[in-house]
Amino acid sequence: MYVSSLLFLYASESYESFIFHFQMCYNKAHNGFMPSIFQQLKGLGEGLQWKVGISLDHQEKQTSSHEKEMTSPNSATRLIPSDWRRELLAGTVSFFAAVYIIIVNSSILADAGIPQEAGIIATILASAIGCFIMGLWGNAPLVIVPGMGINAMFTYTLVQGMGLTWQQALAAVMMSGICFFAISMTSLVEKLRTAIPASLQEAISVGIGLMLVLIGLHKGGVIASDRSSVIAVQSFADPGVLVTLATLALTCILYIRKVPGNLLLAIIGGSALAYLFKAVPSKAATGVGGSSWSSYGDLFGQLSVKGASITTLVIAVFSLTLVIVFENVGLINAQLKMSGRTERFKRVTQATSLTVILSGIFGTSPTVSTVEAAAGISAGGRTGWASIATGTLFLLSFIAMPVITLVPDQAVAPILIFIGGLMMPAVRHISFERMEEGLPAFFIIAFIPLMHSIVDGIAIGFISYALFHIAVGKWREVKPLFYIISLLFVMHFVLQTM
């Protein structure tokens, strides 16, 4: 009778009732009353263990043993159904938190001369393949996409500032990825991170954030170049200005209220406002030619160093590598701690560096481990399956390409401004009590946006930091590797005068 009842409960998936009756049978059998039934129950229980997540012999240790399995390198093969659902949910949450990058990154790449359609395809491929590599090699729930800030460095510093073509800039991306991969195979990645003072690392983040704000205001038509005052605010009678500011307000409100997919919703809302108030140029209103892959053929694998100055290329690769290391190492470490997977640090760093190499081939700015992965980790992501789920959704976004190409600048610009604002809290970690540390940090923060060059802003901050510490007799506090980096930046400025 017990066996037939259990089979009925099993078939009806009444797990709680099944477990209760199963334990009764097991206890009686274990005490010697029904040895034959015990054997039947034991066989049934062993076959059912994957479904209800209990162990006949170690039920009281289920939670702790399962946690150990979830953090082991091969845990993906031992996931129970509830784990699979949680990983899928986490990957979906991460995707909707980061999907805005498809629109924003392609818009920034377009300013470098890369066709927007091709930029969309490159962004999707780099994100999808990056997430797959992270899931399969890194086995961690992190998300890899082209980084905000470093994409601005690609377009506005390397291409527009240093005079590289986008083909040469892509070559610099691939070479910086190779450097990052070589560094990730050794202990140099940690030495490089610790050699740079924390105040300067935080200042770089703040400076890039301010540069994003400046780019966003200009892209949204709120400000424009002016000979008399350098920057001039545009008329608020312009519908484009009003749409940009309204979308910025919408973005902030959605974020403050913690609405899921807030940035994506803000882009959709901003696009609707732009078309409603006819703030969209005719070119954007008609799209850029559908979802044809023909334009991508002119981008994929087109990286080239032909015609590039060796010194300019070296500085570009060196600066990119520094920023890539800074953006990734600290964030990877924090997110792995959050997910309880700190033992995966080396593999995750290697996976990230591999995707940077592929970024140059696909035709986009460097990929990074993005902060949006925290949303997926909070939703329960613990293994690489969450990343694989995110990558799969990125591939499926190809379906939406005809719609993505219709998104106007007025819907993208507020996202740049908002993300720049999110980078401001880093200023709290900068100490201005010791001016030999505070002033170089200030120089980086001010000069990156005002000189419109991430490389030059970092260079001035690094050189002044070394100089000030020597001047006040605290040169021993600075690591030798930092002096070497500072000298390389000095050479950068010297070569510019020749």
Curated annotation (Swiss-Prot):
Entry's localization field: Cell membrane
Keyword Nucleotidyltransferase in record: no
Membrane topology of this protein: Multi-pass membrane protein
Membrane spanning residue stretches: 88-108, 118-138, 142-162, 169-189, 203-223, 236-256, 259-279, 312-332, 357-377, 388-408, 412-432, 443-463, 478-498
Any Gene Ontology CC annotation: plasma membrane
Top-level taxon in the UniProt lineage: Bacteria
UniProt xrefs under InterPro entries: Azg-like (IPR045018), NCS2 (IPR006043)
Record key words, sorted: Cell membrane, Membrane, Transmembrane, Transmembrane helix, Transport
Activity regulation statement: Inhibited by the proton gradient disruptor carbonyl cyanide m-chlorophenylhydrazone (CCCP), but not by the sodium gradient disruptor ouabain.
Pfam families associated with the record: Xan_ur_permease
The keyword Transmembrane helix belongs to this UniProt entry's keyword annotation: yes
GO molecular function: purine nucleobase transmembrane transporter activity
Main subcellular location: membrane
Function: Transports adenine, guanine, hypoxanthine, xanthine, cytosine and uracil. Transport is probably proton-dependent.
PANTHER family tied to this protein: XANTHINE/URACIL PERMEASE C887.17-RELATED (PTHR43337), XANTHINE_URACIL PERMEASE (PTHR43337:SF2)
Family designation: Belongs to the nucleobase:cation symporter-2 (NCS2) (TC 2.A.40) family. Azg-like subfamily.
Name recorded for this polypeptide: Nucleobase transporter PlAzg2
Originating organism: Paenibacillus larvae subsp. larvae (strain NRRL B-3650 / LMG 16245)
